[in-house]
């Protein structure tokens, strides 16, 4: 019954947004209230669940999104994004530009959370699409494919790292096998899928105009832009800071030296929000003050960036409310009961449970972590490689992202797509990542 309620809730949401043309945020709130009541949630818990969902989601990403939007806007308004774009175009050529985006996104995706990588790469990818006069989606699909694969499969991302700890898997093996699975999966879900998507939703690839969330884009002569080195450094600084902190953290876990004040300070600096604040302050200097741009002009760019993402943040928060209602309403517990006593292979079972929880709850990390408790009892009676079970759980947890997932709304709003176009691109892309990932994991299980 809970899964039927979830399905009806999703259909109601689609009707409100696509049929009645109701504002997306309002629609999410209305459906969240309705689904909460239908699931039998006590009246005094409904509002608190919705507030917790909005607060929990925005508490995680509001700072990152806000600071990332300002950082991206400064790099774009100074001409730094255009300089990076023009240099990549010149080095790789128009024919190979997709591969440049895939490589850059994969490297960035290893170090950064999905949403951080997205807000940093969007201005650069948009600048490339404008420079070459090609569809933003032609580059956007490979970009998000690389970011999503690294988020689902590779440590030090929270999902794979936490799952490995729960299963007792060797983190080095997870990383090694994760790379083996991730590379072909990105190629299939990125450049190859882009060709297919262009056939099923050609209208979405015709959208080469400005992205509303980035505001009006300026164009520059090459000599007016900052140098390539300083532009890349400014854009990559959050990645550098977080990567250094992560490496030191991993060394501490591996070597086992004691915690101290220095390590605590490094973790503080390496936190995504702290790294973004530091990077933004550096960008104010490198993209503004150093180039004799008045501080007021720089701050105007920051203010514009914030004003342009307000509705996007509310929509993402609304998605978080829907997700929390499903979790608090007991949908996850219902799914757990369905799989008690099953005799399926741990790899397939881990993928299947994570997939159902992902579709039902929306959060990849919640789906992955919830799966571990159901799969762990089966691992004692199996000789399956634990690293592969970790990867299978990660693969299942990214499947079929839809309206209860913040990533769905990020992709839709950033690329200016309709609901139908978002389902045909983003949702299908995430499903391909999940299914292709499982396929490569099963192949790998034959030899390891």
Swiss-Prot record:
It is found in: Cell membrane. The keyword Cell membrane applies. Pathway: Carbohydrate acid metabolism; D-gluconate degradation. Keywords: Cell membrane, Gluconate utilization, Membrane, Sugar transport, Transmembrane, Transmembrane helix, Transport. The keyword Ubl conjugation does not apply. One of its GO terms (molecular function) is gluconate transmembrane transporter activity. It is a multi-pass membrane protein. The chain crosses the membrane at residues 2-22, 23-43, 52-72, 106-126, 134-154, 174-194, 228-248, 269-289, 302-322, 347-367, 373-393, 428-448. Signal peptide: none annotated. GO terms for biological process: D-gluconate metabolic process; gluconate transmembrane transport. InterPro entries: Glcn_transporter. One of its GO terms (cellular component) is plasma membrane. Belongs to the GntP permease family. This is Gluconate permease. It comes from Bacillus subtilis (strain 168). The lineage of its organism: Bacteria, Bacillati, Bacillota, Bacilli, Bacillales. The gene is gntP.
């Amino acid at each position: 019954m809970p899964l039927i309620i979830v399905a009806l809730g999703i259909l109601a949401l689609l009707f409100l947004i696509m049929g009645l043309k109701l504002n997306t945020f309002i629609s999410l709130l209305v459906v969240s209230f309705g689904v909460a009541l239908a699931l039998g949630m006590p009246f005094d818990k409904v509002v608190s669940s919705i507030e917790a969902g909005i607060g929990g989601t925005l508490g995680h990403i509001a700072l990152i999104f806000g600071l990332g939007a300002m950082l991206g806007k400064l790099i774009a308004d100074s001409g730094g994004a255009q300089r990076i774009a023009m240099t990549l175009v010149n080095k790789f050529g128009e024919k190979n530009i997709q591969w440049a985006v895939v490589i850059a996104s994969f490297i960035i995706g290893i170090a950064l959370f999905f949403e951080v990588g997205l807000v940093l790469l969007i201005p650069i990818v948009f600048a490339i699409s404008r420079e070459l006069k090609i569809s933003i989606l032609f580059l956007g699909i490979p970009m998000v494919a690389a970011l999503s694969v690294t988020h689902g499969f590779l440590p030090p991302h929270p999902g794979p790292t936490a799952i490995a700890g729960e299963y007792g898997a060797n983190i080095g093996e997870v990383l090694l096998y994760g790379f083996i699975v991730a590379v072909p999966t990105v190629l299939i879900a990125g450049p190859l899928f882009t060709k297919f998507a262009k056939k099923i939703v050609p209208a979405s690839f015709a959208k080469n105009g400005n992205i509303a969330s980035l505001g009006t884009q300026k164009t520059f002569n090459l000599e007016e832009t900052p140098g390539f080195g300083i532009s890349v450094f400014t854009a990559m600084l959050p990645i550098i800071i977080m990567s250094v902190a992560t490496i030191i953290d991993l060394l501490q876990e591996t070597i086992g030296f004691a915690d101290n004040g220095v390590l605590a300070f490094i973790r503080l600096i390496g936190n995504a929000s702290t790294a973004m604040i530091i990077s933004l302050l550096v960008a104010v200097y490198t993209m503004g003050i150093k180039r004799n741009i008045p501080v007021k002009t720089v701050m105007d760019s920051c203010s514009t960036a914030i004003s342009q993402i307000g509705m996007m943040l509310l929509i993402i928060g609304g998605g978080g409310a829907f997700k929390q209602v499903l979790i608090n309403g007991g949908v996850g517990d219902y799914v757990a009961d369905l799989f008690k006593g099953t005799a399926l292979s741990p790899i397939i079972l881990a993928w299947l449970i994570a997939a159902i929880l992902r579709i039902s709850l929306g959060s990849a990390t919640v789906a992955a972590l919830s799966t571990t408790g159901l799969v762990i009892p089966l691992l004692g009676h199996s000789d399956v490689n634990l690293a592969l079970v970790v990867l299978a759980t990660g693969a299942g947890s990214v499947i079929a992202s839809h309206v209860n997932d913040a990533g769905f709304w990020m992709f839709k709003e950033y690329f200016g797509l309709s609901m139908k176009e978002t389902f045909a691109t983003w949702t299908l892309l995430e499903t391909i990542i999940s299914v292709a990932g499982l396929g490569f994991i099963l192949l790998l299980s034959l030899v390891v």
